């Protein structure tokens, strides 16, 4: 069995005590003091190596593209500012045209997203992972029936409220005294 010696070094200017282990064989104390670990410490795993091999070129190329885009934007801005000043009467119609073009591009993207979700729904339907169309129709019918019932109930409540207000207004008109020239009426 290996033994561990501990030697104490004291620095006259330092008031703290430093322990320095001496090793015989491969035994030490604590983590990282020469003891053999139970886990494999042979280096990076194959997943990490593959991620590095794939990630560095992809990340580098994306970083280069970002730099080129930034440089192009700065150069374009430097060239376009004097043109904006010279051709300012043309800029407003151009801005409107660009705004309409951007709106058209966004609408196109929205239509594409709608089409993609429709295709996804069809594929899920064909695979059988979603509800069938009759089940969806039954669910929609139940929801519509609930909505119609709710609207009917609210209509009845509103009709009752209006009727109560009409009776209340009629009752207050009967209990008041009205005096007209030539007649005196009193209702109670």
UniProtKB/Swiss-Prot annotation:
Chain segments carrying region Disordered: 164-188
Transmembrane segments: 49-69, 74-94, 96-116
Membrane topology recorded in Swiss-Prot or TrEMBL: Multi-pass membrane protein
Hydrophobic: annotated segments: 52-125
Cellular compartments per GO CC: membrane; monolayer-surrounded lipid storage body
InterPro entries from the UniProt entry: Oleosin
Protein name (Swiss-Prot/TrEMBL): Oleosin S2-2
UniProt region (Polar), positions on chain: 2-51
Gene name of this polypeptide: S2
GO annotation (BP), single: reproductive structure development
Family indicated by similarity: Belongs to the oleosin family.
Lineage per the UniProt record: Eukaryota, Viridiplantae, Streptophyta, Embryophyta, Tracheophyta
Keywords: Acetylation, Lipid droplet, Membrane, Transmembrane, Transmembrane helix
Modified positions (N-acetylalanine) in chain numbering: 2
């Amino acid at each position: 069995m290996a033994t561990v010696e501990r030697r104490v070094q004291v620095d006259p200017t330092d008031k703290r005590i430093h322990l320095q282990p001496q090793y015989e064989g491969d035994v030490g104390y604590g983590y990282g003091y020469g003891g053999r670990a139970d886990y494999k410490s042979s280096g990076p795993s194959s997943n990490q190596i593959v991620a590095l091999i794939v990630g560095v070129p992809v990340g580098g190329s994306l970083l280069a593209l970002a730099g080129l885009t930034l440089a192009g934007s700065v150069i374009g801005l430097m060239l376009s500012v004097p043109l904006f000043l010279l051709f300012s009467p043309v800029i407003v119609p151009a801005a409107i045209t660009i705004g309409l073009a951007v709106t058209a591009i966004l609408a196109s993207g929205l239509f594409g997203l709608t089409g993609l979700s429709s295709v996804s729904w069809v594929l899920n339907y064909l695979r059988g992972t979603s509800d069938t169309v009759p089940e969806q129709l039954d669910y929609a019918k139940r929801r519509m029936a609930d909505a119609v019932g709710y609207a009917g109930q609210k209509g009845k409540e509103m009709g009752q409220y209006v009727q109560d207000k009409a009776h209340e207004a009629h009752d207050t008109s009967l209990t008041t005294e009205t005096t007209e020239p030539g007649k005196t009426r009193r209702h109670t």
